[in-house]
C-alpha cells in the first residue's frame, strides 16, 4: 500500500504553519512589569528616548529594543553575550563609573542614559557638567546630554 500523495501532502505544510503561527505569540512578552522595567518613565519620555542614542543596562536595553525596534539606537541589550568580551567589559566599566566612562559615552554618541538610580554611573552623571537629569523614580533615572 502506498498512500496517495494528494491525501498526505497537506499535513506537513499545515503543521509548519501552525508552529510558525503559535511561535509569533511567544516571540515577545506582552507586558513589562514596572517592578523590573522603567516602563512609566520610558512612556513619559518616549519621544526623547526614541530620537536619542541611549546607554542603558542590558536588560532594559532589551525592553527598549522591543519598544523602539527601528532605528536601533540602544548601546546594549539582552544579547550582550554575543557582543564580545571587550565590548561587554567596556559596558560594565561605564556602568560602574570606572575611568574612561565619559570617553565611551562620547565615542558612541550617547545622548541619553537610562540606568538604575543607584548605579555608580548615575551618581557621577548627577554632578557631571554637560548632563541634565530629566527624571528620577525610585528605581531608575534618565539623563540627557546637553552637548549636541
Pin down the residues of each PLM region.
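Short periplasmic/luminal acceptor-recognition loop of GT-C membrane glycosyltransferases, typified by
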Residues: 48-85, 111-117, 143
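Periplasmic/luminal catalytic loop of GT-C fold multi-pass membrane glycosyltransferases
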Residues: 67, 87-142
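Short, solvent-exposed mixed-charge patches
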Residues: 147-148
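Membrane-proximal, lumen/periplasm-facing interface regions of secretory-pathway glyco-
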Residues: 1-49, 59-61, 68-70, 80, ...
Amino acid at each position: 500500500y502506498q498512500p496517495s500523495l494528494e491525501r498526505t501532502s497537506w499535513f506537513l505544510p499545515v503543521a509548519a504553519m501552525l508552529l510558525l503561527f503559535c511561535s509569533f505569540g511567544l516571540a515577545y512578552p506582552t507586558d513589562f512589569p514596572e517592578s523590573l522595567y522603567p516602563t512609566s518613565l520610558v512612556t513619559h519620555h518616549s519621544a526623547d528616548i526614541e530620537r536619542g542614542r541611549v546607554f542603558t543596562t542590558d536588560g532594559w536595553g532589551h525592553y527598549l529594543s522591543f519598544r523602539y525596534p527601528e532605528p536601533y539606537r540602544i548601546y546594549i541589550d539582552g544579547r550582550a553575550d554575543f557582543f564580545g568580551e571587550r565590548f561587554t567589559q567596556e559596558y560594565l566599566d561605564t556602568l560602574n563609573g570606572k575611568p574612561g566612562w565619559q570617553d565611551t559615552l562620547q565615542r558612541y554618541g550617547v545622548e541619553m542614559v537610562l540606568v538604575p538610580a543607584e548605579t555608580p554611573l548615575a551618581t557621577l552623571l548627577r554632578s557631571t557638567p554637560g548632563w541634565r537629569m530629566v527624571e528620577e523614580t525610585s528605581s531608575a533615572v534618565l539623563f540627557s546630554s546637553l552637548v549636541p
